[in-house]
Amino acid sequence: MLRRKLGLYLALIRWNRPAGWLLLLWPTLSALWVASHGFPGWHLLTVFTLGTILMRSAGCCVNDVADRDFDRHVKRTAQRPVTSGQVSVREALVLGAVLALLAFGLVLTTNAATIAWSFAALAVTLAYPFAKRYVSMPQAVLGVAFSFGIPMAFAAVQSRVPLLAWVLLLGNLCWVIAYDTEYAMVDRDDDLKIGMKTSAITLGRFDVAGVMLSYLVYLSVWALALADIPQAAIYWMAIGLAGLQALWHGWLIRKRERDDCFKAFRLNHWLGFTVFAGIALSYLAA
């Protein structure tokens, strides 16, 4: 019984699908390296890595509770633990609260600026699941939530959030719109039936173009914002490789096949890793 319940809790937080928290982790670590002008130290690396995993897991709990009445009508999500009734709403909320408190405990080991910004991050995280009911581009709200590790990373290192952090957040928001639109393309038919709002529905026949434009803006903003990074040739090479991956994703989603769109979404963490690797190697080579 205990083992079964643990398995359901792990399924609730998508433990077997690390792509979700990796999408959060790479831009956060990139910001840590930029703010620190290199390796940020083991303390901050540990805090932000574990904090990212914990908050993404907490977000899954909140999201599944908020979407439980919608998810039962979507083939891909109908068997999620909360939707199927295997985990109660109360259990999911308690688990989410515990995970969020653990993440906050990590934040408390940093500084006052990071602690203050963590409340804003929490507010956006809680708002996203409900944005899908009222906002035609809820992926933009998710983009803010998934990018908030960037200003928090700068705050942890520099005790302030400079303009550069917000520029990087804006660029990263476009990346989130790109990959979450791919994700939304998988469920578009079901979402239309139940009245869910997504960028894939809003963009309509311009969905693929919207995805590719979002990739272009993301990579362009990050390339220009960090143009003066040490050993910039390494970073520019990484941006080029990330661009090739984006083009491949465009090829995958061109026919709007569900499996191919989902594959493109799942592979996005490699694009984020490529950008992070370029940043880390540039500072290492300096």
UniProtKB/Swiss-Prot annotation:
Q: Which GO terms describe its molecular function?
A: 4-hydroxybenzoate polyprenyltransferase activity
Q: Which domain of life is it from?
A: Bacteria
According to Swiss-Prot or TrEMBL, what is its membrane topology? Multi-pass membrane protein
Name the UniProt record assigns to this protein: 4-hydroxybenzoate octaprenyltransferase
Q: Name one Pfam family in it.
A: UbiA
Keyword ATP-binding in annotation: no
Cellular component aspect of the GO annotation: plasma membrane
As recorded in UniProt, its EC number(s) are: 2.5.1.39
PANTHER family per record: 4-HYDROXYBENZOATE POLYPRENYLTRANSFERASE, MITOCHONDRIAL, PRENYLTRANSFERASES
Looking up HAMAP family in the UniProt record yields:
UbiA
State which pathway it belongs to. Answer: Cofactor biosynthesis; ubiquinone biosynthesis
Q: For this protein, what reaction is catalysed?
A: all-trans-octaprenyl diphosphate + 4-hydroxybenzoate = 4-hydroxy-3-(all-trans-octaprenyl)benzoate + diphosphate
Name its cellular compartments.
Cell inner membrane
Residue spans crossing the bilayer: 19-39, 42-62, 92-112, 115-135, 137-157, 161-181, 206-226, 233-253, 264-284
The main enzyme category here is: transferase
Q: Give me any GO biological process, just one.
A: ubiquinone biosynthetic process
Q: What is its main location?
A: membrane
Described by its record, this protein's role is as follows: Catalyzes the prenylation of para-hydroxybenzoate (PHB) with an all-trans polyprenyl group. Mediates the second step in the final reaction sequence of ubiquinone-8 (UQ-8) biosynthesis, which is the condensation of the polyisoprenoid side chain with PHB, generating the first membrane-bound Q intermediate 3-octaprenyl-4-hydroxybenzoate.
Q: Does the keyword Zinc-finger apply?
A: no
Q: Which organism is it from?
A: Polaromonas sp. (strain JS666 / ATCC BAA-500)
Q: Which cofactor does it need?
A: Mg(2+)
Family affiliation: Belongs to the UbiA prenyltransferase family.
